[in-house]
A protein has these predicted regions:
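Short beta-strand segments enriched in small/hydrophobic residues
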Residues: 2-12
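Short, solvent-exposed amphipathic alpha-helices that sit
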Residues: 14-34, 48, 52, 75-76, ...
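Short hydrophobic segments within beta-strands
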Residues: 5-7, 67-68, 148
Length: 160
């Protein structure tokens, strides 16, 4: 029993909708007693996400988990903390600066992360190949999903 909160940035962010559909379907099948509440639409912006959270916070009972496919995690956590509803598990996507700080502080359980540089390199190579600006055959590499916990946070790779 309890509530699982889900959050996407907005309907236009590619990949978030597919994640949400798969997650909700699996959760409904495996844990039918959990109530799923959607807190999507803040576009990962603190103020907008805070407004959305304030509009739903009163109806939240025991928050067992949060699955955030988008941003705005600081706003979500702050609203839940103010309501005394911090979740048992909080899962976020992408190891950006905000999520890095939150996981270092122990406020996130884990972050699902993939290397955006590999994804961008694939897009750039496909562009070059399409316009016949690359003579070698197109070879794409899948970016591997990493599960980042407070115990295995990778070092920051900065390029100058």
């Amino acid at each position: 029993d309890g509530t699982v909160l889900t959050s996407r940035s907005n309907d236009r962010f590619l990949g978030e909708e597919e994640r949400e559909v798969a997650f909700k379907g699996t959760l409904a099948r495996l844990c039918p007693n959990l109530r799923i509440i959607d807190a999507s639409g803040g576009s990962g912006v603190h103020v907008q996400t805070s407004r959305i959270m304030q509009s739903i916070i009163a109806g939240l009972d025991h928050v067992r988990a949060v699955y955030s496919m988008g941003g705005g995690n600081t706003a979500i956590l702050n609203a839940l903390e103010q309501n005394g509803s911090l979740p048992d598990v909080y899962v976020a996507h992408d190891l950006d600066n905000d999520n890095r700080r939150l996981i270092e502080d122990g406020r996130l359980s884990f972050v699902l992360h993939h290397d955006l540089r590999v994804d961008l390199q694939n897009v750039f190579q496909a562009f070059l190949h399409h316009h016949k600006l690359m003579v070698v055959p197109l070879h794409t590499t899948m970016s591997h999903i990493q599960v980042v916990t407070p115990e295995n946070i990778p070092p920051i790779n900065r390029r100058f």
